[in-house]
């Protein structure tokens, strides 16, 4: 159910808000990469969820641009 809630939230936002959310997720992904490199990361599943959310945002942005 969480994914559907996330999609509803993303679809309810404007393109500018989606761009901001995408930037935040990219920063989070960068932070996760740095933590993994230093051996501090314990939750590897966060990579997958961040990448998927970025892909969802990109899809919704392209849908709204049509």
Swiss-Prot record:
Family: Belongs to the universal ribosomal protein uL29 family.
MF (Gene Ontology): structural constituent of ribosome
UniProt-listed CDD domains: Ribosomal_L29_HIP
Name of the gene: rpmC
Highest taxon, organism lineage: Bacteria
PANTHER family, alphabetized: 60S RIBOSOMAL PROTEIN L35/50S RIBOSOMAL PROTEIN L29, LARGE RIBOSOMAL SUBUNIT PROTEIN UL29C
Keywords attached to this entry: Ribonucleoprotein, Ribosomal protein
One GO process term, biological-process aspect: translation
The protein's name in its UniProt record: Large ribosomal subunit protein uL29
